[in-house]
Amino acid sequence: MKILAAMSGGVDSAVAAARAVEAGHEVVGVHLALSRMPGTLRTGSRGCCTLEDSMDARRVCSQLGIPFFVWDFSERFKEDVVDDFVSEYEAGRTPNPCMRCNEKIKFAALLERALALGFDAVVTGHYARVITTEDGNRELHRAADWAKDQSYVLGVLTHEQLKHAWFPLADTPSKAQVRAEAAERGFSVAKKPDSYDICFIPEGDTRAWLGDHITMRPGLIKDTHGEVLGEHPGAQAYTVGQRKGLALGRPAADGKPRFVLEVRPKENEVIVGSRELLAVHEIRGIRATWAGVPVEQAARFLEEPAQLGARSEEFEVTAQVRAHADPVRAKAYMTWAPDPEAEEEGALRLETVVRLLDPLSGVAPGQTMVLYQGTRVLGQSTIARAYSLDREDIQDTLSAGASTSAD
């Protein structure tokens, strides 16, 4: 096959490309330039998307004896990832830019160009498995090494994209083995540290970066009863579950720390409360995509006409709302609900409702909820609302924040 290897400049993509070459494929390496001013992206041992990374990727391709190119995706990255990140925070939501990058850049823009140029598949260094079923369908599964599993951030991929995705590290037992293999091959990136932070925030200080990109207005910090506890420099700088940086005027009556429960951009308010009030028992997600063929209950429901209140049969899942969080057992169903974002009266939106058998803490609107059955990724949706048995539901910031959003 003709393979395009996405070269990040790290050890994982280097070994993935090497395995593709050894498998006998025609491999071409490409590094994505995501900024026209690389100095504005993180530099150093924990970064990604830097000039150093580009040079590391070039050296690996030279050692493998394969062609190497740099593709300028900076404008697309700014529009689809950076601008989206800003507008989501403006609306009081907590986005995941790495998932947006996978969805819009690595497995949309990159794959589209690769297919147009005659490539059969794109190879990356992600830790996840793609399985072809007996009936020819493609499924996304967790990697063999659950400690490094990245199926969560790949939950945005569609069935069509999975047809052209290859993850050679899928069955590698550990990251240590990948590094050992890289060292044996003489790759200089064998000991290069992993990158963890957001690549376009140079110093890793999200609040300071947002302050340079969003107009912040001072406002009030309140408890769940509406009592004013303090002031904040801008509601958009806070996220659900946050404890640090609240600067409250006095301690809680019970002496326990307080956490952000809600961000209300329309009112420019931050609502705080005890850790116990962060517990969420039901989540509603929108903009669902399926990583393969939808489960039977959802597939049947999606064939029926949209009708307010209609719902599918329940199906058992495990739900994960953060990249490295433990999944929790749940029951899910699809339903048609009023669309608060639509201008047309009576418009409906499709929602994924997940009832958690064990509560989750600190679920924020805007986060991605990925559903699994066993090791298989069913799909994902963007969290619109979360409900707690202990307090009123977190308001739907996908509509409440619309007046301040740049969408």
Q: Can you describe what each PLM-predicted range is?
A:
Residues 11, 123-407:
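AMP-forming adenylation/ATP pyrophosphatase catalytic core
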Residues 1-155, 175-177, 260, 393-404:
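ATP-dependent adenylation/nucleotidyltransferase module used to activate substrates
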